[in-house]
Amino acid sequence: QVLLSGSWNLNPWFVQVEQVPMTEIPIGYVGVVISFVGTASEDISGAAFTHGHLVETGHKGVWVEPLYPGKHPLNTRVMKVELVPTTNIVLNFTARITGGHGYDTNLTALKLLSFDGFSFDLEVFQVIHIGSMDAPKVISRLGSMQNVVDQVLRPIVGNYFRNSAQEYTILDFLTARSERQAEAAEYVKAALRSYDVQAVDTLIGLIT
C-alpha cells in the first residue's frame, strides 16, 4: 500500500515503511501500468480488441487508463510502468543515424534486389505516432516500444520494400523515388493501423 504525504498512526510491530521516489512520467510520454496484484481482472477492451486484455485502474493486468506527465505514487514492487512516447518519433533504417530514443539502434539500410537484377541499399526513415489512449492497447499487445519496432515495424517496412523492389528496375527507384515513397507510405499506414500505431510518413533516403 502506498502512503501519501501526511501524518500516519502505524503499528511498527506490524508494518514497515519504506520511502521511495515517486514514479515520474516525462513530458512527451505516457506511462502504461502493468499491475501484478489487485482486484481480479475483468477484460474491458471490448470485442474489437482481440490481441490483449485491458483492465480498470486498480485491477490486476494492463490498466486501460495511461499515466500522464507528472509524478505518480505507485508501488513499483508490484507494478511495472512502460513509457510510450506520444510525440512523433523517427525510426532510421540506416547505420548513419540513430534517434535519441534508441529504438532504432539495430536498424540498418535495407538490402534490395531490383527487377533487372541489381542489388542496392535503401535508407528509409519512418515517422510514427502513438496516441495516449492507444498506448495501453499497444503495450497489452506487444509488451514494449522496442517490440513495436522489432516485431512489427521492421518486418512490415522491410518486406514491403523487398517485394516492391522486385517489381521495379533500379532506374525506377532513382528517377521516380517520390512515387515509390508515396506507395510505401500508403501501404505502411494501412498496415500499422491494425496495431493501433499511426504511420505519419515514410521517407526514402540514400540509394547506394
Residue ranges and their predicted role:
Residues 1-208:
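N-terminal hydrophobic membrane-entry segments
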